[in-house]
Structure formats: C-alpha cells, structure tokens
C-alpha cells in the first residue's frame, strides 16, 4: 500500500510512542517524513529502525522543542524547505502528568499547556501556509479520551486535550473552503511510554481507575494501532473526515 507516495509529512513526537510508530507507518506507505522531537536519543532509535526497514532515505530528523516559538518558526520553515512542500502535519508530541488538582502547581499547569496546547498551536500556525498551498492539506491533532470523560488526577492534562479538540474544530471550519482537513485522534488505553509513567499520586484510589480498562478484553493497544488510524485519516481514505475526533480506546467509553 502506497497511500503516501509523493506526500510530504511533518510529525512531532517522532522519537517515541505513537509519534514514532506513525513515522514508520507513513514511511512504509511511501511518504517522505520530517520527524521532530525534543529527545535526540529517541530520534536516533527512529533512524535505526528506518535504516533497518530500508526507508531512511525518505526520513529527516530534527531536534525541536515545540513549546519554543522561535525554534518552531525556524524548525517548520526548515522542514518545509527540506521536503519541498507539506501535505500533512501530525501533532503527536505531548506530555502526560498526573496530580491531585488541589496540589497542582502553576508551573505544573503551565508546562502541560506549553507543550500540549501551545505546542500544537505553534506547529499548526507555522505549517498552515504550506498546507494550504497544496489545496489538500491535513492536520492530525492529538486529543485524549480524558478530554470528554472523567479521568481522575488528570484535570490539567484533560484541559489541554479539550483545548486541542476545540482548536481542531475551529481550524477545520476556518480553512475548509481552502481544502484543509483537520481531525483529532483521542487515544485511550494505549500501551506507550507516556501512559505507562503518568506519575500518579502515592495515595491514588485505584478503584477510580478501574473503569478505564478496555471493554474488548484484549488489554491495552500498542502505538501501532493508533498509527494505523492516523494513516487512514491523513490519506485519501479519510478525505470526507474533518472537524471531528475519533476515539481509539477499545470501547472503554461507550
């Protein structure tokens, strides 16, 4: 399957988890990718896998902090120049931290906002001119089931993801007549490095978390499952999908 042959794709969070899995999925389907991440070691692992797969010739890596405006302006500009245009932006980068809300510091709150919400905004703002130039640009943003359903100890994180959903709806409407599609994936119950280490409080009430198990009874899904959904949404197979979010949670929330 070569759904991304001739397509140029910029992916944040490409050094781990779902972002990394998406890099490899797009490369496997013929796309040309610039992967960015704040974690240089993670990007090296992405390159090692691409080299083993024989797709490294279509992959460019850049270390980038998406919460740094100047770095994003320079980084997106360089990525568009390297690719020769831009067809798809996947905003997979993000951080997950848990806390009792009454113990959440302003620094904690601001860090989550800076990376998850502001980072998504900055990347999208800088990528939009190139995405609009082709007339069929796609933005795939990352929300979470926590944006819609109660996830204890995740108030700050959930607020950022709810903001991303609203942001996605707004840009989907604003640029629809210019051919842009904007969609959200809302993963839940995914086995990734981020979800495995959320830093839950020491006195966490595990009974509150029990309801977050997948209904399918298959355990948590891997990052590759979400990457497959992203590939569908970003390709022509998702051509009639915009301004919405798709939950990927194994039926946890039905």
Segments the model singles out, each with a brief description of its role:
Residues 100-101, 105-113, 210-211:
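Substrate-binding pocket helix/loop in short-chain dehydrogenase/reductase
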Residues 90, 176, 181, 241-243:
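Short, small/polar-rich loop/turn modules that mediate ligand/substrate recognition or access, typified
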Residues 144:
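Residue(s) in the substrate-gating loop at a strand-loop-helix junction
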Residues 124, 160:
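Active-site helix of classical SDR
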């Amino acid at each position: 399957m070569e759904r991304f042959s001739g397509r140029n794709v910029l992916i944040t969070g490409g050094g781990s988890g779902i972002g990394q899995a998406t890099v490899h999925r797009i490369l496997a389907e013929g796309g040309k990718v610039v992967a960015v991440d704040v974690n240089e070691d993670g990007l090296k692992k992405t390159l090692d896998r691409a080299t083993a797969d024989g797709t490294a010739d279509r992959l460019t890596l850049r270390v980038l902090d998406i919460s740094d405006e100047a770095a994003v302006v320079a980084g997106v500009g360089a990525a568009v120049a390297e690719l020769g245009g831009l067809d798809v932006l996947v905003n997979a980068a993000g951080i997950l931290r848990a806390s009792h809300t009454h113990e959440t510091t302003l620094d904690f709150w601001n860090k989550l906002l800076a990376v998850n919400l502001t980072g998504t905004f900055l990347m999208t703002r800088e990528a939009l001119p190139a995405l609009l130039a082709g007339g069929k640009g796609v933005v795939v943003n990352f929300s979470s089931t926590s944006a819609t359903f109660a996830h204890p100890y995740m108030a700050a994180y959930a607020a950022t993801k709810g903001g991303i959903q609203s942001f996605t709806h707004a840009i989907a409407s604003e640029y629809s007549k210019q051919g842009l599609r904007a969609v959200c994936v809302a993963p839940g119950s995914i086995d990734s490095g981020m979800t495995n280490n959320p830093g839950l409080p020491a006195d966490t009430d595990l009974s509150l978390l029990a309801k977050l198990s997948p209904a399918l009874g298959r355990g948590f899904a891997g990052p590759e499952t979400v990457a497959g959904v992203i590939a569908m949404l970003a390709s022509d197979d998702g051509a009639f999908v915009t301004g919405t979010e798709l939950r990927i949670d194994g039926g946890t929330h039905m």
